[in-house]
């Protein structure tokens, strides 16, 4: 009498282990209800709407705060933990996986939009335009991508990235012209109304972390200090401590997440002015969401099952908190701290894999974005009554794949790359304003698919790299400078005579490939 029942213990254990996920789901529901109630019973000014969403803004700021130290520390320690040959193999496998899934997503999107034909029953004039068209040149965008891979100032790369801007050169006689404004001038001509225009290239910097440049630098830096032996030990220890401290901060931020998400959702519902646009673009949205659902529920799990031979949906359930966060905040980079935590703690993916693969995936693996761009381009062509040739469809496929890889993991990046895709096949770039009104919603779902693709990638790459990781674990020639250096430990069970385990960072790894948390775990 008085003993708790097993079912009661199970419920308490379940609530204790999943309280954050459950509270986040509850926050989403309450946010929707609160947004609908406030929208229906009061008229808020733009200033009131801004103040209402303030708690959600704080959540976004906190998550973005830890992006920089997390990417830098995880990439450097992850690469330094691996032999250069092993890191090369892991990197190649990750890139092949990213490229393959992106191509599959593009093909899936084109097949769906060609089959469903969401734009055939509508015309351009039937849909209200929203916002303005981003001014983007395909050549400038590709060159900026390469420039940002090699930042000229590492400190500046932490808060700015390079972005080219074109300015029209006024004739010498024009008092408004100034042909000597910058030292580097590129003459470009366009024919418009029988007039030749010249443009000059103005180098500018826009706010935002240059994630790609930092990843390239951290990759090289990690390889170098990994080969420095004892001289590099102090740097390895520093970045390991930085990574652990950052994840501790992430745990604190997670406690505030339900409150922030509640006001993010409610604020967005209050902010939307024209709900009629969802009816007009309903078939287009259904096409995009169907493609994202097929890719995330069938394609990615099937790839995971074929390679890993484990239940993919159990793996996806372990990433539930990260997926829900991505759905709410619409940024794969800002979701990265939560993605790390779920992959390493819930799914117990080797930290040497997550630290190397996840930052790269959050930058270049954009399956959802690629699918969306392919669908949107064909949809706009259908609205204009244009029949795309096979060559144009192939061009859309290639451009959407390349543009999604170059897109940064930030909100609304799809619109910028969308202009590139439209320009590649001669479609009017200004028609991107037709879909801006619903982009905020679709952006959340495609971000969730991007994060899910990154997560499955860690599991697949870990399985494919199992042989190399085991060789590092049991190698007799262990590099003591390695941040995941192997130290022999003893097991407190009857198999201690037949098994030998090694401390791998915060994990105990034995030859039976069983992974469990030890008292040295930092999580």
Swiss-Prot record:
Entry binding sites for Na(+) 2: 363, 404-405, 407
UniProt: Na(+) 1 binding residues: 98, 101-102, 361, 365, 367, 450, 454
Chief localization: membrane
Free-text disruption phenotype from the record: No visible phenotype at birth. Mice are born at the expected Mendelian rate, are viable and fertile, and do not develop any neurological symptoms with increasing age. They show decreased spontaneous locomotor activity. Besides, urinary excretion of glutamate and aspartate are strongly increased, but glutamate and aspartate serum levels are normal.
Spans through the membrane: 19-38, 62-82, 94-114, 205-228, 238-265, 286-307, 353-379, 440-461
Tissue expression profile of the protein: Detected on neurons in the brain cortex, dentate gyrus and hippocampus CA2 region (at protein level). Expressed in whole brain, brain cortex, hippocampus, cerebellum, lung, kidney, small intestine and skeletal muscle. Expressed in the renal outer medulla, medullary ray and cortex (at protein level).
Domain notes: Contains eight transmembrane regions plus two helical hairpins that dip into the membrane. These helical hairpin structures play an important role in the transport process. The first enters the membrane from the cytoplasmic side, the second one from the extracellular side. During the transport cycle, the regions involved in amino acid transport, and especially the helical hairpins, move vertically by about 15-18 Angstroms, alternating between exposure to the aqueous phase and reinsertion in the lipid bilayer. In contrast, the regions involved in trimerization do not move.
Name of this chain's protein: Excitatory amino acid transporter 3
Gene (name only): Slc1a1
């Amino acid at each position: 009498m008085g003993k708790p029942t097993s079912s009661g213990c199970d419920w308490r254990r379940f609530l204790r282990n999943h309280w954050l996920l459950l509270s986040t789901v509850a926050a989403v529901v309450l946010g929707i209800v609160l947004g609908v109630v406030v929208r229906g019973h009061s008229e808020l000014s733009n200033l009131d709407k801004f103040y209402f969403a303030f708690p959600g803004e704080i959540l976004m700021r906190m998550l973005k705060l830890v992006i920089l130290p997390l990417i830098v520390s995880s990439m450097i320690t992850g690469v330094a933990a691996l032999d250069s040959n092993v890191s090369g193999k892991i990197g190649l496998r990750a890139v092949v996986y990213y490229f393959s899934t992106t191509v599959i997503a593009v093909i899936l999107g084109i097949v769906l939009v060609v089959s469903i034909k969401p734009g055939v029953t509508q015309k351009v004039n039937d849909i209200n335009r929203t916002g303005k068209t981003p001014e983007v040149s395909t050549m400038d965008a590709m060159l900026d991508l390469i420039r940002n891979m090699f930042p000229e100032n590492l400190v500046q790369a932490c808060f700015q990235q390079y972005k080219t801007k074109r300015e029209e050169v006024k004739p010498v006689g024009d008092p408004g012209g100034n042909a000597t404004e910058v030292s580097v001038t590129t003459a470009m001509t366009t024919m418009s109304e029988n007039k030749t225009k010249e443009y000059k290239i103005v180098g500018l910097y826009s706010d935002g972390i240059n994630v790609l440049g930092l990843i390239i630098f951290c990759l090289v830096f990690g390889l170098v200090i990994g080969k420095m032996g004892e001289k590099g030990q102090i740097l390895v220890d520093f970045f390991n401590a930085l990574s652990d401290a950052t994840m501790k901060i992430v745990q604190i931020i997670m406690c505030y997440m339900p409150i922030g998400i509640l006001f993010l959702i409610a604020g967005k519902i209050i902010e939307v002015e024209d709900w009629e646009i969802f009816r007009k673009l309903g078939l287009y949205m259904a096409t995009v969401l169907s493609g994202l659902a097929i890719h995330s529920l069938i394609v990615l799990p099937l790839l995971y099952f074929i390679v890993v031979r484990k239940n993919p949906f159990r793996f996806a359930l372990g990433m539930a908190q990260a997926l829900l966060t991505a759905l709410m905040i619409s940024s794969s980079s800002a979701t990265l701290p939560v993605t790390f935590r779920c992959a390493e703690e819930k799914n117990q993916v080797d930290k040497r894999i997550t630290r190397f693969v996840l930052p790269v995936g959050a930058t270049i693996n954009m399956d959802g974005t690629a699918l969306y761009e392919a669908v949107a381009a064909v949809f706009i062509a259908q609205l204009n009554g244009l029949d795309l040739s096979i060559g144009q469809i192939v061009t859309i496929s290639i451009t959407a794949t390349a543009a999604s890889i170059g897109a940064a993991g930030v909100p609304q990046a799809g619109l910028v790359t969308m202009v590139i895709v439209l320009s590649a096949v001669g479609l009017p770039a200004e028609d991107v304003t037709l879909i801006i009104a619903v982009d905020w919603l679709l952006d959340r779902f495609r971000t969730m698919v991007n994060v899910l693709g990154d997560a499955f990638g860690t599991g697949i790459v870990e399985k494919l790299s199992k042989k190399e990781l085991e060789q590092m674990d049991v190698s007799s020639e262990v590099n003591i400078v390695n941040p995941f250096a192997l130290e022999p430990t003893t097991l407190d069970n009857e198999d201690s005579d037949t098994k030998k385990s090694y401390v791998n960072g915060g994990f105990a790894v034995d030859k039976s490939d069983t992974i469990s948390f030890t008292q040295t775990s930092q999580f």
